[in-house]
């Protein structure tokens, strides 16, 4: 057999092998890779059904059709907010979901939308309020320091639009890939001490993907045309100086007047109960945001006559903000009082008010001698350590879970 014939046979055999492999790959792709259009039926309502190409996650599929399910972690599976009921399709529940969904809920079909693969037709059940959620491109009005590590971001809603939120609600804010240099932050001189002490100016936040985070609103519904947030910068802890800084908080701190920002909402469940019970608000740090929203709404919009008090914890005097606003509310409303406790007052503060941690101050100066602390409603938002301490104290006083309302975002 000549060399040319052998060569031709070799080429032919190789070609056949390649074609067979391509056929196998295409067959596997047809079975494993999502393709074609699928339909997601929603709430057994034909008008709400959506049709779209297969692929991706349920959270993104819904968002692509203007249905925005809350997800504070941006779809990472860590916040557990995007719980929906999948009645048909979606595959088996994943291990990543089981830390947020118990066995009973899993059996009933509850899933994290950010973890559900969209491979075929599905039937899902969504809360009706989700259909009122929208997106807006807002303009930054101002972004000013209110404390050493807290800025007040004030956004203008597009003209003619409104965000129909309730006090205690929150929005989600989005950011595209970006780089933020902390040395470029505009921070008043009075707050430089800690920034210099820990050399926080050296940090850089680099984000390579689109991110979404949730923030409670400090504004209340009567403040038309604006959204106001209190944002604490998430700097690396002193014991872990090489840890990356918070992505979204760094981005928000870099914003300047005139910048455009995309938000979606409104979302929320941290709403005031419609009762006559006494209201006790407890806050710390950026947990001020929903406290301000609730208290302003109760006193300025609803003109509530319910007995209420606000207990706020701060490190030192320069970390107190909105003081004039709350002083004025206290002067105008005999049913409202507010107190601040400093945990680390400075000598120059000349502080004569309460000192120590806010849960101890609240207990020693009010609840210890209260006739029926278990009958009050407690609204709180602050650092996790504060929240845990307050909840333990309330439990020891016999307060039931239904009267302890916690916003986890503000700390």
Swiss-Prot record:
How is this protein positioned relative to the membrane? Single-pass membrane protein
Please tell me where [2Fe-2S] cluster binds in this chain. Answer: 73, 79, 82, 114
Specify where the region named Catalytic lies, as residue ranges: 276-393
Q: Name its GO BP terms in alphabetical order.
A: sodium ion transport
EC code: 7.2.1.1
What cofactors does the UniProt entry give for this protein?
[2Fe-2S] cluster; FAD
Cofactor annotation remark = Binds 1 [2Fe-2S] cluster.
- Entry's Gene3D superfamilies? 3.10.20.30, Nucleotide-binding domain of ferredoxin-NADP reductase (FNR) module (3.40.50.80), Translation factors (2.40.30.10)
- Taxonomically, the superkingdom here is Bacteria
Q: List the Pfam families.
A: FAD_binding_6, Fer2, NAD_binding_1
Ranges for domain FAD-binding FR-type: 133-273
GO molecular function per UniProt: 2 iron, 2 sulfur cluster binding; electron transfer activity; metal ion binding; oxidoreductase activity, acting on NAD(P)H, quinone or similar compound as acceptor
Q: Tell me what reaction this enzyme catalyses.
A: a ubiquinone + n Na(+)(in) + NADH + H(+) = a ubiquinol + n Na(+)(out) + NAD(+)
Which Gene Ontology CC terms are recorded? plasma membrane
Q: Is Coiled coil one of the keywords UniProt gives this record?
A: no
Keywords in alphabetical order, please. Answer: 2Fe-2S, Cell inner membrane, Cell membrane, FAD, Flavoprotein, Ion transport, Iron, Iron-sulfur, Membrane, Metal-binding, NAD, Sodium, Sodium transport, Translocase, Transmembrane, Transmembrane helix, Transport, Ubiquinone
Q: Where are the transmembrane segments?
A: 5-25
Residues in 2Fe-2S ferredoxin-type domain copies: 36-130
* Subcellular location(s) per record: Cell inner membrane
| Subunit | Composed of six subunits; NqrA, NqrB, NqrC, NqrD, NqrE and NqrF.
Q: Which family does it belong to?
A: Belongs to the NqrF family.
Function as written in the Swiss-Prot or TrEMBL entry: NQR complex catalyzes the reduction of ubiquinone-1 to ubiquinol by two successive reactions, coupled with the transport of Na(+) ions from the cytoplasm to the periplasm. The first step is catalyzed by NqrF, which accepts electrons from NADH and reduces ubiquinone-1 to ubisemiquinone by a one-electron transfer pathway.
Report the protein name in the record. Answer: Na(+)-translocating NADH-quinone reductase subunit F
**Which organism does this record belong to?**
Haemophilus influenzae (strain ATCC 51907 / DSM 11121 / KW20 / Rd)
Record gene name: nqrF
